[in-house]
């Protein structure tokens, strides 16, 4: 077991931090490379994350040659050989996003079999919208023994309305529809920047996708797609996490290559709290205030406030001088991190999907456990300002979405370290709290 140990109290982050390629963009784009029947695809700006390694293994076991050059942050994929139809259970069960291989496999093979996905324990997150989309394109769906199968002799374009703008469903249906005969119109689609990035690579590959980033997408089916070179868009959630870190520590941090247009709701909320946000030529600078003001947040599908920034916002709200209200509308069961923050003397109440955070308490370091990916980052952020030592465990979640998070914080001046069991025992024997 590993832990991140945070020595908090008077941390002020200063300097420059580099943002990686987006986890939420690279995973569906890796799946999209299965559609390339000609050539070798090269993906650049690929983040070194455990989820990326998992997706690489899912793809490899479909009879695809894949190589990850970690030094160059590049992945090459040769999917020109006949593909398998079944995604490997060992890897699919670890990560929910692996369900997005289903659309490309259905489009390419006319047959896809995928185990029910795993991942972070954030609510139910059903995949019924994915399956309804496949059915609308002419696929037969079979659910049996923990597996889902989609079978179609031919996919036919159709008009599909999503009851909710699900990111995963939008991606899966897009990738199936690019090979469907005729025109597919998808209404009430997800509009996240990662959707636009997926559409960009699909169009480079020879697809005809119109309207990505808007509420309605139109896709004209094509017969074949080919390999391309593509650079993954920057990670707006990692950028947002460091923006919050700077703001809550009275810091002064330049987040390199962060795209302000992708973080408008967060910028608005941090400004309300007193932070100064400056757009510079090579990124976004965040200067934290001496006194943080409270602010209310309601998560929404893009372009609303992102649910993936909710935990980090609760971290900064703990130190605001007043009461903040958070309303989570995207996922249920996404306040588990708040129970861990209570261990640090946080004053809060949870009522269904609403959390009331009374800021201004003196928070104390404690041993806490990450309950999901963003919770892991949020607990570390609270530790930066809490008095004493905070120990954050269950780092498998952190590694799914952040590359060397502790090292980036160290570079900005934080007193944090990542230690293994042996070093933990040594420190516990010598440290008085």
Curated annotation (Swiss-Prot):
Cell wall formation. Adds enolpyruvyl to UDP-N-acetylglucosamine. It comes from Enterococcus faecalis (strain ATCC 700802 / V583). It is an enzyme of class 2 (transferase). Phosphoenolpyruvate binds at residues 23-24. This is UDP-N-acetylglucosamine 1-carboxyvinyltransferase 2. Pathway: Cell wall biogenesis; peptidoglycan biosynthesis. It catalyses: phosphoenolpyruvate + UDP-N-acetyl-alpha-D-glucosamine = UDP-N-acetyl-3-O-(1-carboxyvinyl)-alpha-D-glucosamine + phosphate. The active site is at 120 (proton donor). The modification 2-(S-cysteinyl)pyruvic acid O-phosphothioketal is found at residue 120. UDP-N-acetyl-alpha-D-glucosamine binds at residues 96, 125-129, 308, 330. One of its GO terms (molecular function) is UDP-N-acetylglucosamine 1-carboxyvinyltransferase activity. The lineage of its organism: Bacteria, Bacillati, Bacillota, Bacilli, Lactobacillales. GO terms for cellular component: cytoplasm. The gene is murA2. Belongs to the EPSP synthase family. MurA subfamily.
